[in-house]
Amino acid sequence: MELEAMSRYTSPVNPAVFPHLTVVLLAIGMFFTAWFFVYEVTSTKYTRDIYKELLISLVASLFMGFGVLFLLLWVGIYI
């Protein structure tokens, strides 16, 4: 197959929205991270719930991870 016959790859996410996605995803991730820290500091060992801790930390890590991914794409580090 020749190079001219191939179709050009286009990203499923428009690069113009990388900055917006970065800010929104990182803001949501930092909110859940702060919520996790406040939960850990204000709860006693008797009132802690491991499933709530895992859920909050999982959501925070997902949003922060995708936020960092789009941050790298925004600055030109294409991974």
Curated annotation (Swiss-Prot):
Q: Which Pfam families match?
A: Ost5
Cited InterPro entries = TMEM258/Ost5
Name by which UniProt lists this protein = Dolichyl-diphosphooligosaccharide--protein glycosyltransferase subunit TMEM258
**Which GO terms label this protein's molecular function in UniProt?**
oligosaccharyltransferase complex binding
Cited function: Subunit of the oligosaccharyl transferase (OST) complex that catalyzes the initial transfer of a defined glycan (Glc(3)Man(9)GlcNAc(2) in eukaryotes) from the lipid carrier dolichol-pyrophosphate to an asparagine residue within an Asn-X-Ser/Thr consensus motif in nascent polypeptide chains, the first step in protein N-glycosylation. N-glycosylation occurs cotranslationally and the complex associates with the Sec61 complex at the channel-forming translocon complex that mediates protein translocation across the endoplasmic reticulum (ER). All subunits are required for a maximal enzyme activity.
Gene encoding this chain? TMEM258
Going by the UniProt record, its keywords in alphabetical order are: Acetylation, Cytoplasm, Endoplasmic reticulum, Membrane, Transmembrane, Transmembrane helix
Cytoplasm as a keyword? yes
| Recorded superkingdom | Eukaryota
Q: Which family does it belong to?
A: Belongs to the OST5 family.
CC terms in the record's Gene Ontology section: cytoplasm; endoplasmic reticulum membrane; membrane; oligosaccharyltransferase complex A; oligosaccharyltransferase complex B
| Chief location of this protein within or outside the cell | membrane
Biochemical pathway? Protein modification; protein glycosylation
Q: Which organism is it from?
A: Bos taurus (Bovine)
Provide the transmembrane region boundaries. 17-37, 59-79
